Amino acid sequence: EEQVRAALKKDAQSVDAIGLLALIQGARGDTAAAGASYRQAAELAPQRGDVLNNYGAWLCANGSPAEALTWFDRALADRTYASPASALGNAGGCALKAGQPERAAGDLRKALDLDPNNPYALESMARLEAGRRNYFEARAFIERRLAAAPATASVLQLAIQIEQGLGDKVAAGRYQQRLVKEFPDAATATPGANAL
């Protein structure tokens, strides 16, 4: 953090340094400061897709999914943005949180067209399909998600819910065992605790 602050003393308008400061602030739990830094970076670089995507992701994670969608749209308008799959995946997951399943499906499918192994997009598609009770489709997405990146407690809980929806007690039990082994603290919570 000291190096970032030193860089900002040299150039108070350094978007990259401000973005890094936002990451540091968020990691240490200073949510308000992180949000202010992300917003400052976005205002200083209104055409940079990476910066706009980061601010949108922060907004979505902090309870403003509808507002976040406008920032993802702005990020995607940057034709030089090197990671549109990231912004599309974030937009899709955020649209799901905002209660816009049709937009979510469209953005997530576009993200997966660009990056078929995007873990967040795969998890969000599994969540979307499970919410629609399309459990076979949800299973396919959760299996791809588990192959693409290490499991998290929420992913394993979602896998349990999907297998329960399919009536496959054996597969649900396997995921439950993994949850207990890999995330003992999360395993004590109700497996259905994470909303679809």
Regions from the PLM with identified roles:
Residues A6-A7, Q40-A41, R74-D78, K110-A111, ...:
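Canonical positions in the second alpha-helix
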Residues A17, V51, A85-A87, A121, ...:
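TPR alpha-solenoid repeat register
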Residues K10, E43-A45, D78-T80, L114, ...:
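Structural marker of alpha-solenoid helical repeat scaffolds
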Residues R145-L196:
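Terminal, low-structured helical/coil segments at or just beyond the last alpha-helical repeat
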Residues S14, R48, A82-P84, N118, ...:
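Residue-level recognition of tetratricopeptide repeat
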